[in-house]
Regions:
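Q-loop/switch helix immediately C-terminal to the Walker
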Residues: 99, 104-119
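Hydrophobic anchor residue at the start of the ABC signature
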Residues: 155
Length: 219
C-alpha cells in the first residue's frame, strides 16, 4: 500500500498554503511532516485523509498487498497496484488529531463500540481501555474527561483500528509524561506493517520516523 502525492496544492482564497508537492509514502515505513506553525502541516494531513479538498494535483492511495479488515498483509497478488477510489479512502485510514471531535454524551466504552461499527478493532474495547489506562473511567461520559484522557481515547481509536494507514497530528497534545510514554509504547507495539505519518514540529513526537517531508519547501 502507498500514498502518492502528485503536484499537490492547496489554497485558501488566493493564498497558496502549499504547492507542487511530489511525494510517496509506503506501507511499513514511518514519516514525519514537519514545519513551523502555519506552514500547512495539518492542512496537508487533512487533504491526505480526505477531509479537505485540494485545489490542484492528486492524492492517490493504491493497495498492493493489504487485505482491508484483516489487519495483516495478504499473500495474494490480485490486489497489487490497485488504485482505491476516493470514496473508499476512509476504510484504509485511521487518524488522531486535536481537532477530532469525540461524542461527549457517550462513555469511552460506547465510543469504541460505536467506532467499531465503521472500522474493526484489533482488540475488544475493554482491553483497549485497559491498555490506554482508561479502564477506571470506561463508563463515564466523555464530557467529564480531562483533556489528557480525551487524547488517550483519540489515540486508542486510531491505533486499534484495523487499517493500514495511521495519521497522527500533534499526537502528544495534552498528554503528561505517562501519556507520552504510552504514545511511544503504542508506536512500538501496534504499528508493525503500517504506514505511519506524524504531523509535528516537536521531535519527541516523530523521533522514530525514517523520513521527513519539510513543508517549508513547498510554499
Amino acid at each position: 500500500m502507498k500514498i502518492t502525492l502528485q503536484n499537490l496544492g492547496k489554497r485558501y482564497n488566493r493564498e497558496w498554503i502549499f504547492r507542487h508537492i511530489e511525494y510517496e509514502f509506503i506501507v511499513g515505513k514511518k514519516y514525519a511532516i514537519t514545519g513551523s506553525n502555519g506552514s500547512g502541516k495539518s492542512t496537508l494531513l487533512q487533504v491526505i485523509a480526505g477531509s479537505l479538498m485540494h485545489n490542484e494535483g492528486n492524492v492517490e492511495i493504491s493497495s498492493q498487498q493489504w487485505a482491508v479488515g484483516s489487519g495483516q498483509l495478504a499473500n495474494t497478488t490480485k490486489n497489487k497496484h490497485q488504485t482505491i477510489s476516493n470514496e473508499q479512502h476512509y476504510q484504509y485510514i485511521s487518524i488522531a488529531t486535536p481537532y477530532l471531535e469525540l461524542i461527549e454524551e457517550m462513555t469511552a466504552l460506547e465510543m469504541l463500540r460505536f467506532h467499531s461499527t465503521f472500522k474493526q478493532l484489533i482488540l475488544p474495547a475493554a482491553e483497549i481501555l485497559q491498555i490506554v489506562n482508561l479502564q477506571a473511567s470506561a463508563n463515564k461520559q466523555i464530557r467529564y474527561y480531562s483533556s489528557g484522557m480525551k487524547q488517550r481515547l483519540k489515540l486508542a481509536l486510531a491505533f486499534f483500528s484495523k487499517t493500514p494507514i495511521l495519521l497522527l497530528d500533534e499526537p502528544t497534545t495534552n498528554l503528561d509524561e505517562d501519556g507520552i510514554a504510552l504514545y511511544h509504547q503504542l508506536i512500538k507495539n501496534y504499528t508493525t506493517n503500517k504506514l505511519v505519518i506524524v504531523c509535528s514540529n516537536d521531535k519527541q513526537e516523530y523521533s522514530f520516523c525514517e523520513e521527513a517531508l519539510e513543508m517549508g519547501r513547498y510554499k
